[in-house]
Structures are given as structure tokens and as C-alpha cells.
Amino acid sequence: MVNDIIADSLTRLRNASMRRLEFTQLYYAKIVVSILEIFKEKGFIKDFNVKDKDKKQSVYVQLAYDEKGHSKISEVKRLSKPGRRVYKQKNELKRFKNGYGVIVVSTSKGVITNEEAYRQNVGGEVLCSIW
């Protein structure tokens, strides 16, 4: 059993992109699906789908690459960990990496990006960053 499913998912994405794999498989969790929806919206992954197999759900992710074959994921980091939670207020969630990167924040309004949290005037737990 995995203790931190978000960190495990991010590590699997990072390893698959470094190996230039087309697909990778992740454990299913609602929060992982929420994070993947943001990654897809921002163009870091092409697509993902949830599949049932023997009463266990898995998420299959299709990674995105540019025309030269380079991964669109340069780096992905887990910021808030089970042993050390990181929370940020609205004014601390402005642009990240000059707009090229995204911080994923868990707020009272759901899992959203740092820019959306700033616009909606909410803070929350900073889950991960990607660029």
C-alpha cells in the first residue's frame, strides 16, 4: 500500500516522461484524477482514462511530447507532504515560473491552479508544482 498516493503518481509521471514512454499507469484516487484534469487542461499530458480491472481502478495517462520528442513535463514536485503540510494564502499564490508553471492547490472550492485560487480569492494546501 502506498502512503502518499500523490507523490507516487508524480514520481510515476516523472519517470515515464524521462524514459519517453507514451503511457503510464497510476493508482486511482479522486484527488489524483483532479490533479490530472489540471495537467491535461494546461497541456502537460495528452489524455487520461480510468479503467476497472479485477475490482481495482487504475488511471492510464498518455504523456505529451513536443515535435522534437521532448517531454512537456520539465519537472514535477510534491510540495505539501504528509509529514509537513504547506498552506498558502491567496496573496502568496501569484504567478509561478513566469506563467510557464502551475501550482496545484487544494482549496475549499476544490483542487485548482494557483492562478484560479488567486482570482477566486482563496488559499489552501499547496499539493504540487509542475513546469
From Swiss-Prot:
PROSITE patterns found in the cross-reference section: RIBOSOMAL_S8 (PS00053)
Keyword check for rRNA-binding: yes
Entry's Gene Ontology molecular function annotations: rRNA binding; structural constituent of ribosome
Gene Ontology CC: ribonucleoprotein complex; ribosome
Record-level GO BP terms: translation
Keyword set, alphabetical order: Ribonucleoprotein, Ribosomal protein, RNA-binding, rRNA-binding
Xref: InterPro entries: Ribosomal_uS8, Ribosomal_uS8_CS, Ribosomal_uS8_sf
Gene3D superfamilies: 3.30.1370.30, 3.30.1490.10
Keyword set includes Ribonucleoprotein: yes
Transmembrane segments: none
Family listed: Belongs to the universal ribosomal protein uS8 family.
Cited function: One of the primary rRNA binding proteins, it binds directly to 16S rRNA central domain where it helps coordinate assembly of the platform of the 30S subunit.
Cross-referenced HAMAP family: Ribosomal_uS8_B (MF_01302_B)
Summary of subunit composition and partner proteins: Part of the 30S ribosomal subunit. Contacts proteins S5 and S12.
Listed PANTHER family: 40S RIBOSOMAL PROTEIN S15A
Protein name per Swiss-Prot or TrEMBL: Small ribosomal subunit protein uS8
Natural source organism: Helicobacter pylori (strain G27)
